[in-house]
Amino acid sequence: TIMYRPTFNFSKGNSNSGNFSETLNNESTPINRKEATNHQTNDRFSTNGSLQLNRKLNSKGRNIALRLYYDLDDGNSDRYSLSNTYYLKYGDSIKTLNQWIEKLDKNNKYQVQITYMEPVFTNRFIEINYSYQHRSSLSEKYAYDWDKQEDTYSQYPDTAHSDCYKNKYSTHQTGIFFRTIRTNYFYNIGIE
């Protein structure tokens, strides 16, 4: 028996936002205020699925099964952020931050599981299984400052506002079980 069940998803979107904040002193006099606007576009693709193969080896219940599972998720976005911070306490001054922020996210997972079942008595079986799972994640964010001289965003990222990380890990798991199957009940005893 072979069964394969995949799913796919794709999405696109964009958003605009703005905010205003103000800091006051004890006399309720503004000491600074901040105005910010953001425009963002993003798209994401994800897919997952499972493939299962079952092989019956005899009529008494001996069989072997293989199951493969995967889950993949990729997303990226572009955000244009402009903020002006006005410092009012010691005379008027302004700090402007104009950035293009590029972000990438990847999350992957796959698992392989094999199960063998051997009949030992009537309606009683020994099951042995093994599974291997691997996960990985990647996140990259690069922020590019506006270059007034070039009248465009810098080709080099601003390290103070950029970051990236990558994680990987794997797990192995095995187990053995004694299984009893009756018309009105069943039970498992085992370790893994």
Task: Give the label of every model feature segment.
Residues 1-192:
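Primarily recognizes Gram-negative and organellar outer-membrane beta-barrels
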